[in-house]
Amino acid sequence: MVDTVGIVGLGLIGGSLARRLTERGVRVVAWNHRQHPYAQAEADGIFCKSTLSELMDAEPDVVVLCNPLKAMPAILAALAPLMGDHPNTTLTDVGSVKGMVRDQVKAAGLGKCYVGAHPMAGNELSGWQAADPHLYDGALWAITVDESTDYRRFLDVAAMITKDVGNRVIVVDDETHDKAAAMISHMPHVVSTALINELVANPDRNIAAALAAGCWRDMTRVSLTDPDRTRAMVEEDSLNVEALLRRMAARLTDMADQLHAGAAGEQDVMGFFAEGDPFRRYKAAVTHAGITAAQDDTATAAPQAGTTAAGFPERELAVPEAGWQQTLLFSARRGEAITGFVHPRQAIVQLRPAM
């Protein structure tokens, strides 16, 4: 049961989370390295603290680190002596790279109380002024665990996400998460930025920009993100992003060669566009099943398997004491997501289309 949540960092992600939790009846205490958001945050019902020590004195059940990853070592060093006086508090974060954060958490001596998390929510904006509780509407979170993750602490974070935030959860290990995040988030930011860089370098850029419509808008939205934020995100997952960019460059070079070959490369060109058919079928199934419909954000005191408001079937999943991490990882690989718990060892999982 999560009664109080501590938020460290009131930017876009942390501020939106704090506002959403507060709106849903959770007591939220927060600390930000600059206090300029405090007046508005307190008007929204968030209890702002001057120091991390004051935040911990509020006895939060879960502390969520929403600070930039470059600030993580300093924040962890400041929290380490405070967490020792609050052994029941669980530590989590919202960073988009998990392996590096876990290493930093362990280096600070906080590994035993840590459970990684990453909400797949966000936009091209930043700062408290962009904070919006609806940012988390229908969001999926990745919770990252390893062999030493304490199950009780995992439940703290999972309950906060499913019950208090009203979102879904999958459970993965750090390496799997970081490779997947590079594929669906970090690498696309680079590709999107390359597109606008190509436009800027084009002598007819003003004509091209005037002709741009839906395709260009959709493919370049994330390029509008603060460049410093994008650079940091990409560099923090650099090995995975580098590997993907090299594979992407090879694909594009092959396509250029096939187009250069003219009629001789026609079959290869068709093969290029047909290769993604499994994803097209997946997206069609997702849309048909209703994943694009608004998620049911109404928490229930006693969840049970059935059919969600969005139209997805659900089932119960037993979570064993031994090997629970692998059980939940296999569930994620089947395309399932946790929506709640009947009791601590019985999860409710949503059955989603899979490729």
Predicted regions and their residues:
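Rossmann-like NAD(P)-binding element
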Residues: 54-86, 90
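NAD(P)+-binding Rossmann beta1-loop-alpha1 motif at the extreme N-terminus of oxidoreductases
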Residues: 1-54, 62
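Glycine-rich, N-terminal phosphate-binding loop of Rossmann-like dinucleotide-binding domains
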Residues: 66-68, 95, 145
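Long, low-complexity C-terminal extensions of enzymes
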Residues: 250, 258, 262, 267-355
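Interdomain hinge/lid region at the active-site interface
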Residues: 207-281
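Internal alpha-helical scaffold of NAD(P)-dependent oxidoreductase catalytic cores
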Residues: 135-224
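Residues at the starts of beta-strands that form the adenosine-phosphate
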Residues: 4, 27, 88, 113, ...
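Rossmann-like NAD(P)(H) cofactor-binding subdomain of soluble oxidoreductases
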Residues: 75-129
